[in-house]
């Protein structure tokens, strides 16, 4: 797709975002730069991407009839899933029946909507190294899986994100509570889980991998720190050996080639020395990649937009994704109930090498990521400290 029309006209190039969170918002902004007509959909009103789209829709995207009706109404040239909670079988059917273009492919969206599809593809079809694992449906199977993979281990619902329903088990005392949490924390409610054995890794990375008209390109590896399964900080580049980087790129190329299509993929990997294990892959921009808003000339969102439109990403003919130096991000979390209000914004931006993105989440109920601070410096450690200082300067209030 190298011809682009004018939005809100008969020539418009229409893109439907299925999911309208903070990552979708940045993708929408990048698409708008190319005059693309953006339609944003999610299960709640005033989601971040809706605030920068030409129009929006609120629906349950797990409802096949509602999803079909939306696509029939909007007639998009591209459907861009931005979350996992979508009735992906409908996308597969529409791709087959009508030639509907799904990014990167409907099959990729279906395989990555839960942990089982992508884990079986990676480990059993492609033979990629992974942690030991078992899938379970009942409490009895869960206990058998723990006995097989051993402690410590991790249990996660097959359908969840941002650490919801995820627990680390270090002793038998953790077993019952972890199962109960997994049955209440997943997107689909009680159900199937994965039990994963622990890998004694040195660090974990996200390797942003771009499939585009000119081939496959890699961003510098992104290191990150998680708490309770949710991203809290990320930085780029993550130092690693040449052998580990080469192996990481081989694994990322294998899984993204199998998924196919164009767009950006977030490939998560565990690294110990020169050894690398596959963890997960998202066929879309990744939350740890928010750091690329300052660390790269083209952010992960700009790369995704360009790739899906068939435009150059600046790394053709053996080139590389250009970096801007050591950079870091720090997530802003709000806890409680209400509409977020941010104080001390000027203080947070006092350092000229810092930046801030407030996502525009309409409300917080419980805890929610509502923004991110970003920083550049002469070293990763210095950039991380700057991002933390900026985050600490902000005060987040929740008002009714």
Swiss-Prot record:
Oligomer and partners: Homodimer.
Residues binding Mg(2+): 268, 280
Residues reported to bind N(1)-(5-phospho-beta-D-ribosyl)glycinamide: 22-23, 82, 287, 361, 368-369
Family annotation (InterPro entries): ATP-grasp, ATP-grasp_carboxylate-amine, ATP_grasp_subdomain_1, PreATP-grasp_dom_sf, PurT, PurT/PurK_preATP-grasp, PurT_C, Rudment_hybrid_motif
Signal peptide limits: none
PROSITE patterns: ATP_GRASP
PANTHER family associated with the record: FORMATE-DEPENDENT PHOSPHORIBOSYLGLYCINAMIDE FORMYLTRANSFERASE (PTHR43055:SF1)
EC numbers, comma separated: 6.3.1.21
Protein name: Formate-dependent phosphoribosylglycinamide formyltransferase
Entry annotated with the keyword ATP-binding: yes
SUPFAM superfamilies, A to Z: Glutathione synthetase ATP-binding domain-like, PreATP-grasp domain, Rudiment single hybrid motif
Reaction(s) this enzyme catalyzes, per UniProt: N(1)-(5-phospho-beta-D-ribosyl)glycinamide + formate + ATP = N(2)-formyl-N(1)-(5-phospho-beta-D-ribosyl)glycinamide + ADP + phosphate + H(+)
A GO CC term attached to the entry: cytosol
Keywords per UniProt: ATP-binding, Ligase, Magnesium, Metal-binding, Nucleotide-binding, Purine biosynthesis
Domain ATP-grasp: 120-309
Pathway: Purine metabolism; IMP biosynthesis via de novo pathway; N(2)-formyl-N(1)-(5-phospho-D-ribosyl)glycinamide from N(1)-(5-phospho-D-ribosyl)glycinamide (formate route): step 1/1
GO annotation terms (biological process): 'de novo' IMP biosynthetic process
Record: residues binding ATP: 115, 156, 161-166, 196-199, 204
GO MF, any single term: phosphoribosylglycinamide formyltransferase 2 activity
Source domain of life: Bacteria
Function: Involved in the de novo purine biosynthesis. Catalyzes the transfer of formate to 5-phospho-ribosyl-glycinamide (GAR), producing 5-phospho-ribosyl-N-formylglycinamide (FGAR). Formate is provided by PurU via hydrolysis of 10-formyl-tetrahydrofolate.
Record Pfam families: ATP-grasp, PurT_C, RS_preATP-grasp-like
UniProt similarity note: Belongs to the PurK/PurT family.
